[in-house]
């Protein structure tokens, strides 16, 4: 092989590597979109389950005649559970702040999310 052939092959390899790099970037973007959609669906699924549980609990409470104190404790338990779910989502790498809610955290910790988490569940 002469120098020209080697140079042409290197240029060809460089071009293929560039194309592969572009394709990897596109696949990465698709994965980010799918992960965000998955997180949104997980949150929606959890909300629907909570709603179903409340509906079941409400119909059982009507039958049993639950006291107001028990109803207040149930409300506080739901709030604590929601906070735990948001903390779990943040730990999995998603924003829980009102600025970027549900999107994937790409650059480490988010101050808005951390300020929300540091406030803890409101009593």
Curated annotation (Swiss-Prot):
Q: What is its main location?
A: cytoplasm
Q: Name one GO biological process term.
A: DNA replication
**Positions of region (Disordered):** 52-72
Subcellular location(s) of the protein: Cytoplasm, Nucleoid
Instruction: Write out the entry's keywords from A to Z.
Output: Cytoplasm, DNA replication, DNA replication inhibitor, Metal-binding, Zinc
- Highest taxon above the source species: Bacteria
Q: Does the keyword Zinc apply?
A: yes
Q: Does the keyword Chloroplast apply?
A: no
- What residues does Zn(2+) bind to? 95, 97, 110, 113
Cofactor(s) this protein requires: Zn(2+)
Q: Pfam families per the record?
A: YabA
Q: Tell me which GO cellular component terms the UniProt record holds.
A: nucleoid
UniProt remark on cofactor binding:
Binds 1 zinc ion per subunit.
- Record's family? Belongs to the YabA family.
Q: What does this protein do?
A: Involved in control of chromosome replication initiation. Inhibits the cooperative binding of DnaA to the oriC region, thus negatively regulating initiation of chromosome replication. Inhibits the ability of DnaA-ATP to form a helix on DNA; does not disassemble preformed DnaA-DNA helices. Decreases the residence time of DnaA on the chromosome at its binding sites (oriC, replication forks and promoter-binding sites). Tethers DnaA to the replication machinery via the DNA polymerase beta sliding clamp subunit (dnaN).
- Assembly behavior: Homotetramer. Interacts with both DnaA and DnaN, acting as a bridge between these two proteins.
Q: What is this protein called?
A: Replication initiation control protein YabA
Native species:
Brevibacillus brevis (strain 47 / JCM 6285 / NBRC 100599)
């Amino acid at each position: 092989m002469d120098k020209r052939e080697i140079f042409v092959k290197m240029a060809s390899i460089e071009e293929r590597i560039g194309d592969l790099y572009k394709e990897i970037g596109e696949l990465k973007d698709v994965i980010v979109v799918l992960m965000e959609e998955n997180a949104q669906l997980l949150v929606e699924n959890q909300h629907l389950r909570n709603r179903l549980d409340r509906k079941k609990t409400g119909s059982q409470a009507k039958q049993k005649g639950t006291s107001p104190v028990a109803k207040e404790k149930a409300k506080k338990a739901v709030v604590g559970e929601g906070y735990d779910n948001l903390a779990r989502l943040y730990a999995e790498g998603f924003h829980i702040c009102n600025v970027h809610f549900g999107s994937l955290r790409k650059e480490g910790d988010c101050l808005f999310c951390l300020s929300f988490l540091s406030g803890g569940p409101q009593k």
